[in-house]
Amino acid sequence: KKMSKSKGNVVVPNEPIEKFGADAVRYWAAAARLGLDATYDIGQMKIGRRLAIKLLNATKFALAIGREDENHHVGAAAEAAWNPADVTEPLDRAAMAKLALVVRQATEALESYEHSKALEVIESYFWQFCDDYIELVKNRAYGTPDEHGNVPSEKAVKSARTALGLGLDAFARLLAPYLPYATEEVWSWMHAGSGSVHRAAWPVVDPYVEAATGASPELLTWAGKAVEQLRKIKSEAKVSMKTPILSVALSAASEGVEAIHAALGDIAQAGRVVGKFDLVAKHAEESAAEGTPETEVAVEASELGEPPAKKPKH
């Protein structure tokens, strides 16, 4: 029903702001399309609160990489400056290619006064960036050796850290109109002493296009689907996600196989694949015969190792 003072069904903002935070209430309001009535929706506010918390946590995590001492204390942040030329790995370049696309689409939407459409575009990629990209590159960003003891090169480590920095810096700017308080907080972490995010320039595509150097954003999509299948193997077996995979074969369309192969090291480490990792290209006819969409990744065969021993409770 439409809010009416005479009907006594007016909701004042004090209560939801105190319960969910001002950013969450602003998110709900911003999600409404221009010219249409907005339904009072607590569910939307909860989503906004979750988005703000995720931005805080993701930024805190990324900024801590490389700054922890042996006691896991995080040192003071150096001045945040990320050079797009340092993004050299295929997966990192794909993430930057998608970011360039998102910046362009969000900018065009806002210039057309479609603020809810801009939010939708930004938010969709933000979750992909956190759930897929960060999970895929965090081991490399930390410089963690793989299951065979191979340590990533300094160049590969720097590539991941630079892409993380460029990405989260962009998201702080992109989400500032929607989550003013959370973005101001993360901006102060990344750019201490440089003023407010609300005085910072809106992102432009140039640095992300430079970092992408012609990469396709689809590489990140395929890599995310591959690691999702590796997790599915473990969830269906009801074992810990830390359980090693001794061998696995994944199938996908030929372009998917090519993309997955380009990010195979990151995918294997994220999924804890310690042995043979085969990729099988499927033709459109095969996918159609099996009723599998051409855009999907499937598990053809897998073998799990022993789950890690549980730590005793003290």
Labelled PLM ranges:
Residues 27-28:
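Non-catalytic, structured segments within soluble enzyme domains
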Residues 1-12, 17-18, 41-314:
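Feature 926 captures the class I aminoacyl-tRNA synthetase adenylation module centered on the KMSKS loop
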Residues 21:
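Short helix- or helix-capping micro-motifs
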